[in-house]
Design a protein with these regions (language model features):
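Stable alpha-helical elements in mature extracytoplasmic
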Residues: 3, 14-21, 43, 47-50, ...
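Paired acidic/hydrophobic, glycine-rich loop segments that form the ligand-binding mouth/hinge
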Residues: 34, 123-127, 146
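Glycine-centered hinge/linker elements that transmit conformational signals in sensory
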Residues: 22-24, 68-104, 150
Length: 167
């Protein structure tokens, strides 16, 4: 939180604000995101969380339900739009620590570490709620790291979706 506040950044209220913040961090000479999709034989699975979140922010809940029920194909325009939204963050070299080429090869467990360097290698990380277990030992949540809601688009009437999962 200190790195974020010291740089003059505030928590975005909308997806439009999050994209503006991403661009501002780049313009300020920083790197907005740490993203890692590496996971051995399961490499790529963290991207599903991003795509699901983007699906819920670009499409109606009914469309999301059709998608997970396999009533619309993975290459439907709605799903492609959600993948493209994730691509905005992950496929732009300046947006990601190590550049876009590092996204697939960076292990998801290691990906948040850049937030804890000085100066920070990145300011934000998006991952499941278990990710603090991979933060550096001694990290105090609320002091050394904090969280904010992945905002919805202000220009869409889709509410404030939340993605949950279980095992």
């Amino acid at each position: 939180p200190d790195n974020f506040a010291d740089a003059g950044y505030t928590v975005p209220e909308s997806m439009e604000d999050l994209k503006t913040l991403t661009e501002k961090i780049v313009a300020d000479g920083g790197t907005p995101w740490c993203i890692g999709l590496g996971s051995g034989g399961a490499t790529g699975w963290p991207a599903t969380d991003w795509v699901e979140d983007m699906m819920l922010r670009t499409q109606s809940p009914e469309t999301y339900d059709k998608w997970y029920k396999h009533e619309i194909p993975f290459n439907s325009p709605e799903v492609v739009a959600a993948i493209d939204e994730f691509g905005y963050f992950a496929k732009t070299d300046a947006n990601v620590a190590g550049g876009a080429g590092a996204v697939a090869s960076t292990d998801f467990r290691d990906s948040p570490k850049g937030m804890f360097s000085s100066p920070p290698q990145c300011y934000m990380h998006h991952q499941a709620s278990f990710i603090p277990s991979f933060f550096p030992e001694g990290t105090e949540l609320g002091t050394d790291a904090d969280f904010f809601y992945m905002p919805a688009y202000a220009g869409k009437d889709l509410g404030k979706p939340v993605l949950g999962a279980g095992t």
